[in-house]
Amino acid sequence: MTLVGKLVHISIDLVLVSTCLAGIKRNTGLTPKLETLDNQTMRNYMKRYLNLGESVYDYSVATCGSSTYFARK
């Protein structure tokens, strides 16, 4: 696998993990404690990372909600 292929693969994996964390937040209210991070820059990047997951989660729910293949119960 080329370097570009590996980067794409890792990027997609990171987005999936972030989306999973967003789903956990929505369903249980549990979120990572970002206050435990000492580095302010790292804390800001983690907030952005988690917000990306929230956006992907929202988009996925909206797409599935408007699809004929899914129904709400």
From Swiss-Prot:
According to its UniProt entry, the protein's GO biological process terms are: mitochondrial fission; mitophagy
**According to its UniProt record, what is one Pfam family this protein matches?**
Mitofissin
Q: Where in the cell is it found?
A: Mitochondrion intermembrane space; Vacuole
Q: Looking at the record's lineage, which domain of life comes first?
A: Eukaryota
Provide this UniProt record's keywords sorted from A to Z: Autophagy, Mitochondrion, Vacuole
Gene Ontology CC, one term: mitochondrial intermembrane space
Q: What is its main location?
A: mitochondrion
The Gene Ontology terms for molecular function here are: lipid binding
The knockout note for this entry states: Lacks mitochondrial fission anf impairs engulfment of mitochondria by the phagophore even if it does not affect the recognition by the mitophagy machinery as cargo. Does not affect reticulophagy, pexophagy, nor the Cvt pathway that delivers the precursor form of the hydrolase aminopeptidase I to the vacuole.
Q: Does the keyword Metal-binding apply?
A: no
The record describes its quaternary structure and partners as: Homooligomer. Found as homooctamer in solution, but binds to membranes either as a monomer, dimer, or tetramer, not as an octamer.
- Relate the protein's function as given in its record: Mitochondrial fission factor that acts directly on lipid membranes to drive mitochondrial fission required for mitophagy. Directly binds to lipid membranes and brings about lipid membrane fragility to facilitate membrane fission and engulfment of mitochondria by the phagophore.
Q: Which family does it belong to?
A: Belongs to the ?ATG44? family.
Q: What protein name does the entry list?
A: Mitofissin
Q: What is the name of the gene encoding this protein?
A: ATG44
